[in-house]
């Protein structure tokens, strides 16, 4: 998924800007972006040797992050006391889980409008170039991180 790769790249950039050396063991590739994959990824990260497990996890989607929270709980970790968790998308469930999920919100309506406008432009002129568009996101701070 291109968007997952872009979010991963942003995570790497943020670590670099914060002066944190990224460890390959912190990046867990999953085959799908669902709850179970998040829980399994959290369990795998918590099996790293003492001192190597992360104290914060950024998931590329809120659905994965919800699984991460529960996977951490299953590993005996408390969110956010032991491990902070941040998701991406600000789905409705993010505010309803325990603890409520810190997340990055996308402007969903504007995203849909922009996609439709670009698609109509492409239909009108199949040879027209379609620009890359980056819409502003915002951090929604809740209790998980």
Residue ranges and their predicted role:
Residues 1-145:
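Bacterial carbohydrate/catabolite-sensing allosteric modules
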């Amino acid at each position: 998924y291109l968007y997952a790769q872009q979010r991963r790249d942003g995570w790497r950039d943020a670590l670099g800007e914060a002066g944190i050396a990224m460890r390959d063991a912190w990046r867990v590739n999953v085959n799908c972006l669902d709850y179970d994959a998040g829980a399994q990824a959290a369990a795998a990260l918590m099996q790293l040797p003492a001192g190597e497990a992360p104290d914060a996890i950024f998931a590329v989607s809120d659905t994965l992050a919800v699984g991460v929270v529960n996977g951490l709980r299953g590993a005996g970790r408390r969110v956010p006391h032991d491990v902070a968790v941040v998701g991406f998308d600000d789905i409705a469930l993010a505010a309803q889980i325990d603890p409520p999920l810190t997340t990055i919100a996308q402007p969903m309506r504007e995203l849909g409008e922009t996609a439709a406008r670009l698609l109509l432009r492409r239909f009108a002129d199949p040879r027209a170039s379609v620009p890359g568009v980056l819409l502003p996101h915002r951090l929604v701070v809740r209790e998980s991180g």
